[in-house]
C-alpha cells in the first residue's frame, strides 16, 4: 500500500512539474512584444519573474500546484 502511495505521489509531482513548465513555455513562446501582450513574462533586475495583476493564467497554475502540494501527504 505504501509502495502504491509513493508511486502515486511521484507521478503527481511529475505531472505538476509538467503542467508548471508547459505554462511557462506557452507564455514565453508568444510572438507579441512585452508591451502588447498582457500575458508576457516580465523579469526584475534580480532575475526573478514579476507577476502583473493580469497574469491570471500563471497565478492559477501556481496556486493550483501549491494547494495540491499542501493537501498531499508529502506536504505534511
Curated annotation (Swiss-Prot):
Domain notes: The RxLR-dEER motif acts to carry the protein into the host cell cytoplasm through binding to cell surface phosphatidylinositol-3-phosphate.
Residues annotated as signal peptide: 1-24
Extent of motif RxLR-dEER: 49-64
Residues that carry a glycan: 54
Cellular-component GO terms for this entry: extracellular region; host cell cytoplasm; host cell nucleus
Protein name: Secreted RxLR effector protein 31
Organism expressing this protein natively: Plasmopara viticola
Subcellular locations according to the entry: Secreted; Host nucleus; Host cytoplasm
Family in the record: Belongs to the RxLR effector family.
The keyword Transcription is assigned to this record: no
UniProt keyword terms in alphabetical order: Glycoprotein, Host cytoplasm, Host nucleus, Secreted, Signal, Virulence
Function: Secreted effector that dos not suppress the host cell death induced by cell death-inducing proteins.
Keyword Signal: yes
